């Protein structure tokens, strides 16, 4: 679907300890990010930076936390979902121990971001709009595929228990 791959499963992540420290050095990609933000604003769009949770080690979290420094400097909203208590459970919402959310985790993140964007921006709901019928159809297909694959995974989990 749209270049993505649906992967089902659960992981045994490494122990996760949240850090608030941030990387002091300029990171790869900061220049490009500044250019993207400037281009968005030139086109009348307001960018939003996000930090999507995964079982990151301390060094990775410091890089993620640096985004807040940049967001503050550039006056860009930053939604750091690492700091939303209870949003993602790395035991059940990731399909690998490194960084990828499974459909349950992705659904939680999508719902949270959708609500956040709705509260902070004037966005219209396009569901049911005939001009976006292909999105409704794609969602229906995704949900069917997800139910089948998640059901298969649950069956496998039951056999392994």
Where would I find each of the regions flagged by the language model?
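Active-site segments of SGNH/GDSL-like serine hydrolases
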Residues: 34-60
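N-terminal start-of-chain detector that recognizes signal peptides
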Residues: 19-21, 49-51, 71, 79-80
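C-terminal regions of proteins
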Residues: 59-140, 144-160
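Acidic-and-aromatic substrate-binding clefts and catalytic sites of carbohydrate-active enzymes
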Residues: 23-29, 55-62
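Short, local alpha-helical segments
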Residues: 17-21, 51-53, 90-99
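Secreted/periplasmic serine-hydrolase-like ester/acetyl group-modifying domain
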Residues: 1-43, 128-161
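Alpha-helical context
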Residues: 9-16, 25, 47, 82-89, ...
């Amino acid at each position: 679907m749209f270049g993505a791959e649906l992967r089902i499963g659960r992981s045994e992540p490494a122990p996760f300890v949240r850090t608030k420290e941030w990387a002091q050095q300029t990171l790869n990609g900061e220049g490009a990010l500044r250019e993207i933000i400037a281009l968005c604003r030139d086109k009348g769009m307001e960018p939003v930076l996000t930090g999507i949770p995964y079982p990151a080690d301390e060094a990775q979290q410091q890089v993620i936390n640096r985004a807040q420094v940049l967001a503050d400097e550039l006056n860009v909203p930053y939604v750091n979902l690492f700091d939303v208590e209870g949003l993602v459970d790395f035991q059940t919402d990731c399909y690998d121990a490194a960084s990828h959310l499974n459909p349950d985790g992705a659904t939680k993140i999508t719902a949270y971001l959708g609500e956040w964007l709705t509260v902070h921006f004037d966005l219209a709901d396009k569901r049911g709009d005939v001009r976006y019928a292909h999105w409704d159809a794609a969602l229906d297909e995704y949900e069917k595929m997800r139910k089948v694959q998640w059901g298969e995974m649950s069956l496998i989990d039951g056999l392994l228990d």
